């Protein structure tokens, strides 16, 4: 069965547009089978977009596990002078995110596979609704890889469902060298702020 974290989804394509009204304007996303959030904007993603603090106005920003691009597009709108890196292993997700950014005229979004970001890039902010279902070990490796690329004054905001391990992820991140606090909750989700 095809999973949203597969490189090449085997699910039959059936694009569907979703529309979400935000304080800074309407967000129109084309979604598809085999990509996280088919036919909707996930509740955790919504919470992160609505509750995360202001982003740096410039620099390099990362949407880790971009899916169709809800986070990346929101970041690009809020920080038009920044470069937003939208990263996903899933080819279909990258194609949708790039297309959605283009439809919104957001030219500061660079959609890439994980290994295509230059090594010297350091992130001033990371937003992620991480792929929890890849498994605990793989998730920890993923987070350590990318949080380790934060700029000295950078920070990450992660949204995780409580019943999928948010409350155990927080102390693990702190013990792994990334002091983490919970800054918001809602609809069974936690927003974690890591440094």
Where are the predicted features?
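N-terminal auxiliary segments of SAM/dcSAM-dependent transferases
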Residues: 1-22, 34, 38
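Class I S-adenosyl-L-methionine
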Residues: 2-14, 165-195
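General small-molecule cofactor/ligand-binding pocket signal
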Residues: 30, 110-112, 181-183
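Conserved SAM/SAH cofactor-binding pocket of Class I
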Residues: 43-128
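Short "lid" loop at the C-terminus of a central beta-strand within the Rossmann-like core
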Residues: 132-134, 161-166
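A short glycine-rich, Lys/Arg-flanked "PGG" loop and its adjoining helix->strand segment in the class I
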Residues: 140-152
């Amino acid at each position: 069965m095809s999973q949203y974290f597969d490189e090449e989804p085997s699910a039959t394509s059936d694009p569907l547009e979703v529309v979400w009204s935000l304080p800074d304007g309407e967000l129109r996303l084309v979604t598809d089978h085999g990509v996280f959030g088919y036919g909707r904007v996930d509740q955790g993603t919504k919470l992160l977009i609505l509750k995360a603090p202001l982003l740096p106005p410039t620099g390099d920003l990362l949407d880790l596990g971009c899916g169709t691009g809800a986070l990346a597009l929101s970041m690009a709108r809020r920080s038009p002078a920044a470069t937003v890196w939208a990263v996903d292993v899933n080819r279909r997700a990258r194609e949708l995110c790039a297309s959605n950014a283009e439809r919104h005229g957001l030219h500061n979004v660079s959609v890439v596979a994980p290994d295509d970001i230059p090594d010297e890039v350091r992130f001033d902010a990371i937003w992620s609704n991480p792929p929890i279902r890849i498994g605990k070990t793989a998730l920890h490796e993923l987070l350590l890889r990318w949080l380790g690329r934060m700029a000295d004054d950078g920070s990450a905001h992660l949204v995780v469902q409580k019943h999928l391990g948010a409350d155990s992820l927080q102390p693990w991140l702190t013990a792994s060298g990334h002091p983490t606090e919970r800054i918001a909750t809602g609809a069974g989700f936690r927003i974690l702020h890591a440094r």
